[in-house]
Amino acid sequence: LPSSGEGDILSPVIGPIASAAESHAPGKRRVEKLVMRYRLSRLVVALVVAACAVSGCATNAQYMGAERLAHGLVVSLDGVGGYNWGPQWLRDGLNQAGVRSAIYIFDWGHGPAGMFLADLMDESGNREQARELARMVENYQRYYPGRPVYLIGHSGGAGIVVFALEAMKSTTQVDGVFLLAPALDPDRNLAPALAHVRQNVYVTHSPADVALMGLGTSTFGTMDRKHTVSAGLVGFRIPTNLSAADARQYAKLRQAEWKPDLLSKGNLGGHMSWTTSAFAREYIAPIVLGRPASPISQA
């Protein structure tokens, strides 16, 4: 690895990947090629900037070590504003539940925390961030084939996740996706995104989330630039004009509406209620761990 200032920036991401590759690859040459590719890839810069911007390099690096990378990958995205509180709470819950995969907080925001409207309205910039996420997943799967990959997107971050799925190569699939209070048009055709998911896409929505997912997106628009209530309020509606192939993709969609029994888990039905550590521990982790006991897996 380079010893320059650039190396200091890249090492939190390159180091764990190279170390893990060394233990799994047949020879040193493959490791050297891996490191060189990551030096040249601007994806690395995007990943490390995301790691350092809010959470701090050490915090994200703690969940991106070689052992975790060898288990699998969970990528979590916050909503507009770039504070990344929700992904940190979710990460804590997943870790408490025994998830040993790498857990990466992908910071897709447009600058200083609090740029809510910029994050929401810049569709071209958001799609560029989504392409970066898609390439990140594809690079991970290239060097860790067969490991499980899960994507979690809350609110605006759910839009980035859907855009990323749509931007993936035709042969790329992730294992599962969680769209928590998605700030997307409820009539959006999800079939192109669903085609890149091997198992299921889980959607959570709440009729109590009316301020942000109702009034907010009706006024300022959804991530896909429709001025309407969002799927985070009412869920996704299945289009009526689907082809047979697209209709088969919709068999992967699982939608869970907020219910009063979630109160015992600290979920009051508000916008941030889907991002608590308790929700991650009780509802998301069982699916990531391959234990389909989570109520949302039966939706």
State where each predicted segment sits.
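C-terminal catalytic-base region of ester-bond hydrolases, centering on the histidine
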Residues: 212-299
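Bacterial lipoprotein signal-peptidase II cleavage site
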Residues: 59-63
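Serine-dependent carboxylesterase/thioesterase catalytic core
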Residues: 58, 80, 84-234
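C-terminal motif of bacterial Sec signal peptides marking the signal peptidase cleavage site
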Residues: 54-56
